[in-house]
Amino acid sequence: MKVIIIGGVAAGASAAARLRRLDENAEIILLERESYISYANCGLPYHLGGVIPERKSLMVMGPSRFKAWFNVDVRTESEAVAIDPEARTVTVAANDRRYTETYDQLLLATGSTPVASDLPGTDPDKVFCFWTIPDMDKVIAKAGSGARKALVAGAGFVGLEVAENLRHRGLEVTLVGSSKQVLPALDAEMGSYLAQELLNTGVRIELGHKVVSFENDGSFRAVLNDGRKLEADFVIMCAGVKPNNELAAAAGLKLGPRGHITVDEKLRTSQPGIFAAGDAVEVLQPVSGRQTAIPLAGPANKQGRIAADNMAGLDSEYHGTLGAMVIKVEKLSAAAVGLTERQLQQLQMPYRKIYTHPGSNASYYPGGAMLHLKLLFAPDGKILGAQAVGAKGADKRIDVIATAMRCGKTAPELAVLELAYAPPFNSAKDPVNFLGMIAENMQKGLCESVYSETLPEGAMLLDVREPEEFELGTIPGAVNIPLGQLRGRLGELDKSRKIAAFCRVGLRGYLASRILKQHGFDCANLSGGILTWEAMNFKPRNTAPVPPPKKPEPAAANSRTLDVRTLACPGPVVRLKKEIDAMTPGEEVRLLAATSFAPDLANWVQSSGNELAGMEMKEEHLEAVVRKKSAPTACSLSASAPAPNSDAAMVLFSNDLDKALAALIIACGMAAAGSKVSIFFTFWGLSVLRKNPAPAVKKTLISRMFGMMLPAGARKLAL
């Protein structure tokens, strides 16, 4: 048997190696138009950033070793330019000559190619793709030639990895994405965690825009569709890929609607003796039951193996691609499997969803990290998709769910999966078990969930967190009754009104909803709590890179140390406040906490007026020094009063009548002293300016909800 394989990377190399193991006597020719075969193209961004220091590490196996190990006739820089299915021949172009090879079986593993930039003003010395080793070499040379600014067009897998690694090289990086989110393989709210991570490292993000042309008048600029011009020393185009289908189309093979090669479960094409595998083929999506294209290395390698089995006479089938994926963005990992909520809506498939934010391991064991999980399932319990983002354990949970999906398990059945447990690795109830338990409660009617984007109109928002947490910020209009006080304060709630209970992550909100339901209230839990609400309302804010806080100085022998690494919310905030309250002004405490506590720490320090004297993000926790604010010093009225004719600004954030009056009195006094005074009314302070009765104004759902939560004008302010 003579087999020709066209394409020598993932699917092609896998097929050649498998075929040789099955048939020692087969004649196998591997044609590759580039200079390299069997290389780690998924590792290219990490060599760009220096994470993989040695270029040769990317070469999984060179042509000579592949020949020695597998006795395969490897022909690099040899391009298949034509196929004759009737004569079973392939025409090859190599070294300025053409020749023809016959075959008994043929495998097309031609892969995919980045969508090329044919935009006006494209300069090949400044606009690059990033797909092959030669592409990578060009970008590394450009980045190392004194370049300071880079622009990455495309916010998918490759775009995110390239942006991150260019930043590691010290370049100023702008990431432009045509979608309103990063990584469309996730839903927008789940991708928001990755966007914020990139912003934290200094990457500038422009979403909902695309590059439409380039200008070069001595300064190279990318022109966006809104007319803005972004200066860059070079641009990397990562705006998607297309299948390399030219050979297949010319040979008369059947193609799908997007140009991918159509294959059956044995990876046979429409022409006898021709198989296809990898990025160029159309595959079954088992969840939707429809054909699609999912260009991932894992499926490509498996398809190459299965195609080889069938060419060798074995009976192997490929049962579709669920699309299990994972990506690293700085300290976070994101993983997903199945369909997204957006895809389910497009397909008009009914679904239910769950958000939860558990820890990666037992809360009492140091080094854990928060996971953001989303599960999508059908009304009958069939798992439709899942997404996970976090510093630890995202891949593990999605792997478990992907396996459950392949085995036909339902969402409630995730609750009974027996998964390995020890405190350094997990909690006794794995986060996947939690998802199953929540799904089971929903299926049995024990838990009604509401969602940030579809809050019932007129619902009361009940924040059941502790007062110290509430002070850090909440959903506008929410009322705070801590969970521990709820049973004793039921009289403050209205049974005629829908209640949406929430906490930070969802657990206490669920407990509150169970209490209230059994006391006759119409109550639901806000799925995912305030963390999911924040993710739903995320908008990237590009600011000048802020230098990281200085590293904490070595602690003095008699200094305080507060270790809250093993405390779940609200423990860290409550313990820190208690510690600070017991300290004298100017005294410092060395704080050890989980890395996920960083945003809450920054908010608490700002709202409390204390000082973050230093902070360092370590591998598995953060270390910070918090200094208690100094006591106010006495001063005379004349010393504290503003100078005449100076400007002053005040922010009114409250809807308390006494605070509003105080702000107005102070402003009038300062104006009488000759100062120019501005008052900014924001959030609840907007109540002072509201007209009553209010004029008819067309508003969005969120705006209407916000309006219902505010007092109806200055006369409705409470003390």
Q: Which residues are covered by each model-predicted region?
A:
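Rossmann-like dinucleotide-binding cores of NAD(P)H-dependent redox enzymes
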Residues: 59, 149-150, 157-213, 294-300, ...
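N-terminal glycine-rich dinucleotide-binding loop that anchors FAD/FMN and/or NAD(P) in oxidoreductases
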Residues: 43-75, 188-211, 339, 543-555, ...
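A Rossmann-like FAD-binding core segment of flavoenzymes
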Residues: 25-27, 75-94, 101, 168-263
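Glycine-rich dinucleotide-binding loop and its adjacent helix/turn
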Residues: 108-169, 204, 263-265, 479-483, ...
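Mid-to-C-terminal Rossmann-like scaffold of FAD/NAD(P)H-dependent oxidoreductases
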Residues: 1, 280-392, 423-427, 431-459
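FAD-site-proximal beta/loop scaffold in flavoenzymes
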Residues: 123-146, 218-221, 228-309, 400, ...
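Beta1-alpha1 glycine-rich phosphate/pyrophosphate-binding loop at the start
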Residues: 1-73, 115, 163-186, 324, ...
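Rhodanese-like catalytic fold shared by cysteine-dependent sulfurtransferases
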Residues: 412-460, 467-500, 504-567, 575-578, ...
